[in-house]
Amino acid sequence: MSQVSLSQQLKEGNLFAEQCPSREVLKHVTSRWGVLILVALREGTHRFSDLRRKIGGVSEKMLAQSLQALEQDGFLNRIAYPVVPPHVEYSLTPLGEQVSEKVAALADWIELNLPEVLAVRDERAA
């Protein structure tokens, strides 16, 4: 059995390898706010302030950081209009549409199965 070098693993991608770049992408996509941003943008283009209102509990700082990470990964388009006050819009790229479909399916599954999950949680806490 041959050993696969770290550089080969990084080239091919191996989520279980400590240094694999896919882990950083996974962190951005599956973060608390990343999932909600991707699901919210499935409805279409949103301004920063719209996203902040829509995603309850997110701070301005965390929303900005999460949007920036998703944009850097190629999942979001960001358009800043040169007006006062600032007007910035976010939308999904084709890659973002693909990943948002996956996380939306996970979010749907969670919502559908939440009563059972909560019942098991309560049962095990007792």
Curated annotation (Swiss-Prot):
Gene Ontology CC entries for this record: protein-DNA complex
Keyword DNA-binding recorded: yes
Domain HTH hxlR-type: residue ranges: 20-118
Keywords on record: DNA-binding, Transcription, Transcription regulation
GO biological process: regulation of DNA-templated transcription
PROSITE patterns recorded: HTH_HXLR
Pfam families noted in UniProt: HxlR
Molecular functions per Gene Ontology: DNA binding; DNA-binding transcription factor activity
UniProt cross-references to PANTHER family, sorted A to Z: HTH-TYPE TRANSCRIPTIONAL REGULATOR YODB, TRANSCRIPTIONAL REGULATOR, MARR FAMILY
Protein's name in the database: Uncharacterized HTH-type transcriptional regulator YtfH
Source species of the chain: Escherichia coli (strain K12)
